A protein has these predicted regions:
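Membrane-interface alpha helices of multi-pass inner-membrane proteins
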Residues: 38, 141-145, 179-194, 236-241, ...
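Transmembrane-helix motifs of polytopic, lipid-linked glycan transferases
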Residues: 107-127
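Short periplasmic/luminal acceptor-recognition loop of GT-C membrane glycosyltransferases, typified by
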Residues: 413-456, 482-486, 514
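Short hydrophobic alpha-helices at membrane interfaces in multi-pass membrane enzymes
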Residues: 170-187, 228-232, 305-309
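Transmembrane-helix signature of polytopic, membrane-embedded enzymes
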Residues: 32, 120-143
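Membrane-interface transmembrane helices that cradle and orient dolichyl/undecaprenyl
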Residues: 164-179, 289-296
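Membrane-proximal, lumen/periplasm-facing interface regions of secretory-pathway glyco-
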Residues: 348-417, 429-431, 442, 451, ...
Length: 552
């Protein structure tokens, strides 16, 4: 018995030593470096204009101890029913903000995004690619997703989608009971974001692809006996997703977004990616190289074909869906890269007319202590770089200069001093920040970023004003607007600056405000501010030192 125990101990020691050797080998250090480097592009300041109204909505949910049945932010669609499909995420935003400010929210969302990337890497590892292909593929994917990374609600769906695909692939490859873990995942996901229907769609797509792939005798099909549990998981996950304050209607909510002509044609994040933008070029290169690798290898699984084709179509339709392309297609890209590597090396040798490398005696590795020290120093150095990259993002406050250059921070500070609530016609992407800062004062905005709540008619009305159609003035006045706050150097601002029946009352380096001339005596505004030298707004206002504003 003692000899058996000693042998078991020896095997454990041997296995531990092998893992250490593997982790401290050059390829292991490369993967460790990739894991840290992946965190850099996804760690950014808050750039999503919708973040601010999500935060305020979460504060109101806590304040009212329940979901909001109608719109609290606008004076245009206050009677519309509000389907708060992101209520749990909004509540967490409010709690995190109360505990740790914006810094904690940035940290949590960036960590969630990194965990989604880790799930993608784990799915790719199920096919045992070389570490070179794994690391290179992940780096390409992270750069390809650069246009959409950052602290935003959609990263929750990205991470859950990556986790769903990992568990599905693990089940098809290895079997086991882990697939049933998707049921609680969808219970939570459906209360975080309506994007959970994407996860359900991925499972259904894999099931259909495997059935069709079996008929077509495509390579590496999943065992048929593993498809039935996956079908049961899909049914159960669909059922538990309806355990939600919105009930079964949550399943239909996302379809309204996908079928809205106004949202698809008017909202920038729903536009197709522009390949004239340098940020999109790596995504395009990844897409093109994936197609070339697939043709070169002539070997791809049915479920991989389905996932790549569907997410490619979605990402070409809308830039925001590049995240889904990265989640679904990166493991396929890595697999194709690994399949192509030996053939590409052989082809290069033939071009050089060089013989295959002769087998040589393996060189001994440096001592383990040396390798552990090098590994520790590398990881510590990269971690230090990441912390130096992260901390400035976490330290920014809502009224910092970085945000004042993107959002109407200074104009909101000015309007907050108004003695009475105002009805503000605003830029679509700035409605969220204005709702966050001014709704506690009773001010209302014309529009903000929940396009489904706004409805297509209001979106088209706003688009008509933004593009200065002949009815722009009537549309603003008909809504009962008190003041227009818009970005400088835009068509609307330029037209209003030359309109006799509109008076400019405020301007800073980002925004300009106008009041109908016939309302100057009835709209009570705060005095034009004089910002202290060196303040955030003084530095921002240097772009427009002479406002020419009139304020009664």
């Amino acid at each position: 018995m003692s000899s058996v125990a000693a042998e078991a101990v020896q095997q454990r020691r041997s296995g531990f030593r092998e893992r250490l050797d593997s982790l401290t080998a050059p390829s292991g250090l490369f993967i460790a470096a990739v894991l840290v480097i992946m965190a850099l592009p996804v760690t950014r300041t808050i750039q999503d204009p919708d973040f601010w109204w999500h935060l305020r909505a979460g504060q109101l949910i806590i304040q009212h101890a329940g979901l909001l049945g109608s719109d609290p932010f606008t004076y245009t669609v206050a009677n519309h029913h509000w389907t708060m499909h992101e209520w749990l995420n909004e509540v967490l935003f409010a709690v995190e903000f109360a505990v740790g400010g914006l810094g904690l929210i940035v940290l949590v969302l960036c960590t969630v995004t990194w965990l989604g990337l880790l799930a993608i890497m784990q799915k790719a590892r199920l096919r045992h690619p070389g570490r070179g292909a794994l690391g290179i593929g992940m780096l390409v994917a992270v750069i390809a997703g650069f246009p959409i990374w950052g602290p935003r609600v959609q990263m929750i769906t990205f991470a859950f989608a990556a986790l769903t695909l990992l568990l599905v692939e693990r089940h098809l490859v290895k079997g086991g009971k882990a697939i049933w873990g998707l049921i609680p995942v969808f219970l939570v996901w459906s209360n975080f974001h309506s994007g959970f229907v994407i996860g359900l769609g991925f499972i259904a797509l894999v099931l259909i692809a495997e059935v069709i792939g079996g008929w077509l005798h495509m390579p590496d099909p999943a065992p048929r006996e593993r498809l039935r549990p996956l079908l049961f998981v899909l049914i159960a996950s669909t059922a538990v997703s309806m355990i939600n304050p919105n009930g079964p209607t949550i399943l239909l909510y996302a379809l309204g977004t996908q079928t809205s002509g106004a949202q698809q044609s008017l909202i920038e994040e729903w536009f197709s990616p522009s390949f004239h933008d340098w940020e999109v070029l790596v995504y395009g290169a990844m897409l093109l190289s994936l197609a070339m690798l697939t043709v070169f290898n002539r070997h791809i699984r049915a479920r991989d074909v389905a996932l790549v084709l569907v997410t490619t179509a979605l990402s070409l339709q809308s830039a925001r869906h590049i995240a889904l392309f990265v989640a679904a297609s990166t493991p396929v890209y890595i697999d194709q890269l690994a399949l192509a590597s030996p053939r590409m090396r052989a082809a290069l040798r033939r071009l050089r007319r060089a013989p295959a490398p002769a087998r040589t005696r393996a060189r001994g590795q440096p001592p383990l202590l040396f390798r552990l020290t090098a590994c520790t120093l590398l990881i510590a150095g990269l971690a230090g770089v990441y912390v130096a990259w992260l901390l400035p993002k976490m330290q920014l406050q809502p009224d910092s200069l970085a945000y004042a250059q993107e959002f109407p921070v200074c104009a909101a500070q000015w309007l907050a001093g108004a003695p009475e609530p105002l009805k503000i016609f605003n830029q679509y992407g700035e409605g969220g920040y204005l709702a966050y800062t001014l709704s506690p004062h009773g001010d209302k905005v014309f529009i903000f970023g929940d396009a489904a709540l706004m409805g297509d008619p209001l979106l088209y009305t706003y688009a008509g004003v933004e593009t200065v159609t002949p009815s722009w003035d009537a549309s603003i006045r008909r809504a009962g607007t008190d003041i227009v706050l818009y970005d400088i150097n835009t068509p609307l601002a330029d037209v209003m600056a030359h309109a006799a029946d509109w008076t400019k009352v405020y301007q800073d380096g980002l925004s300009v405000a106008f009041v109908p001339t016939d309302k100057l005596s009835t709209v009570h505004l705060p005095p034009v501010p004089v910002w202290p030298p060196g303040s955030v707004c003084a530095r921002q206002a240097k772009a427009a030192p002479n406002t020419g504003a009139q304020n009664q």
